């Protein structure tokens, strides 16, 4: 009751809180300025693919994962999924022409040693690590040269990298959990902005500080299948999907709309504010 305004970036959070505090709870979508992430010209994308991945990988099917190397993000499970996808790709098409960009620190103390995981799975030639902290302009390039962006987390409040990718027209693969659901599923018609994955199983965990919380898991095989479904799209289908996700991101996560919602809800809160009596502490 001590809070006068609750603005939620995640629609899932909004639906939960409004049940108890409907009068002061609003959905204010996350957003980013439109000049940070945008669709580049085909010629530029081709040039950057050659420069970053090498001439031998410029025509590869490219995926990108942008997260901290930490347990919740499931980086090792992502690599298992990628390995399964490569095996399926070789069976279906006779090659392994695909590269996964992992924008993360492979030796982060919060996560596994990803160099060792890649080595164990024997996929060294199909994983590209982007370890440096880079400017928005360079991140925009990474999203543009990718055919999909994936999030594999078992819990995600929002999932910023998938929105950034959608702003460039890159489709996403994500589990239907937390704030990711509103991104990967078009709430207007139920269609997907890439591949939305059902949760295969839930676990309930917790601590003395957080009594309980659910973790949502998708099996590696299903992530691999999702990757293949993007790979198998025709050029026409890929272009149509790219236009769809870019349009959805610009309309549903409009930066100006977010600014206006923050402004209007704060103005309303101030105008509706009622003075309350100060609390008094009495010894009994």
Locations of regions flagged by a protein language model:
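Short hydrophobic beta-strand element within catalytic cores of glycosyltransferases
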Residues: 171-174, 184-185, 192-196
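C-terminal amphipathic helix plus adjacent low-complexity
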Residues: 205-216, 220-284
């Amino acid at each position: 009751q001590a809070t006068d305004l609750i603005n939620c970036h995640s629609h899932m959070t909004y639906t939960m809180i409004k049940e108890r505090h409907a009068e002061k709870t609003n959905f204010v979508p996350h957003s980013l300025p439109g000049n940070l992430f945008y669709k580049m010209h085909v010629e530029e994308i081709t040039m950057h693919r050659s420069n970053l991945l090498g001439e031998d990988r410029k025509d590869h099917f490219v995926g990108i994962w942008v997260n901290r190397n930490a347990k919740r993000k499931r980086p090792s499970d992502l690599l298992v999924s990628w390995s399964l996808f490569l095996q399926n790709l070789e069976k279906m098409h006779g090659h392994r022409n695909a590269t996964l960009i992992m924008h993360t620190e492979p030796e982060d103390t919060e996560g596994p040693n990803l160099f060792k995981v890649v080595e164990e799975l024997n996929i060294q030639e199909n994983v590209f690590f982007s370890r440096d902290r880079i400017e928005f302009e360079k991140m925009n390039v990474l999203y543009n040269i990718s055919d999909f962006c994936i999030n594999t987390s078992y819990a995600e409040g929002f999932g910023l990298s998938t929105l950034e990718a959608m702003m460039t027209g890159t489709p996403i693969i994500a589990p239907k959990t937390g704030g990711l659901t509103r991104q990967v599923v078009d709430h207007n018609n139920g269609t997907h902005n890439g591949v939305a994955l059902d949760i295969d199983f839930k676990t309930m965990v917790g601590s003395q500080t957080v009594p309980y919380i659910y973790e949502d898991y998708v099996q590696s095989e299903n992530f691999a299948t999702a990757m293949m479904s993007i790979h198998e799209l025709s050029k026409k289908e890929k272009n149509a999907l790219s236009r769809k996700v870019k349009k959805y991101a610009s309309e549903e996560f409009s930066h100006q709309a977010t600014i206006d919602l923050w402004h209007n809800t704060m103005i309303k809160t101030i105008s509706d504010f009622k003075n309350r009596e100060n609390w008094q502490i009495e010894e009994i």
